[in-house]
């Protein structure tokens, strides 16, 4: 299945626009602030039901407008059958609402998303997964696992709600009525939901560690579970009452990413990796994300590349170029970068969108 076309109404800076997407490679060209990343984000949005930037969802709607939509056509490669999909955005006094449609029939989010093409994004900002804090890595894995497993998303939401409520009780401390009973209730919720999260995280990390190699280099992830149990809650309660927050559980899990040198030595690339090694580690994560999604859904994902070529050295550029022949790809680029891309991939099968 491929993305055939996409249309925007009052989405970001687009008023009414429609774009055809090439089955192999589409390059979005244009000066800064012309909307290259907005176009890319719209593709991500129609296939994932959310944008990929940190801004609030209300900002997906064009400034001063109250309603927006993105619609698209997907096509089966073999049968040429076409599917129509659309997401409406509406801004009201209570915030923003999203309505999902397949073939003009209203759907729930999960029902809408489950049969679409998976999508993977590369962008320069994602290097923060490697070079910033542990919470960024936890957020990355949680977001990925939530995107493929509705139960994971539900359990994560339940866990975070229970975590916040338990912290409120710890803030009140001994002044709270029925302290032990209240803590027992929230402890059980944290254990039940947290155990599911840990199992699913461990399963995906095992997958990554079974696919270690990229460009003759090997990487691995050390997943350190912050175990959660009634016994541990009992042992640490006095300290938690002192600091007034929950100190154990998967919200404190750690992911350490290593490059393996000479088959023996492991280098923590967050702490000791060069910029090039950190980028290679990021590519290792994202390439495995592509492969995992392809195996999981039995469909080839769409690859979105946002302004990455100026950030990469020649060696890492070639790694990305090698991917492009295997997946439908949409890339934001400049004329100069596009020329280099076409020369390196030896592929004349592409189209451009000029903004």
Task: Locate each region found by the language model.
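Conserved NTPase motor "head" modules and their coupling/switch loops across ABC/AAA+ ATPases, GTPases
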Residues: 1-31, 45, 177-302, 311, ...
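Conserved lysine of the Walker
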Residues: 36
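Structural recognition of the conserved hydrophobic beta-strand(s) that form the central parallel beta-sheet
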Residues: 72, 328-335
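An accessory alpha-helical subdomain
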Residues: 122-215, 224-227
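Walker B catalytic acidic pair
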Residues: 306-308
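A short helix-turn-beta junction within AAA+ P-loop NTPase domains corresponding to the substrate/partner-engaging
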Residues: 343-355
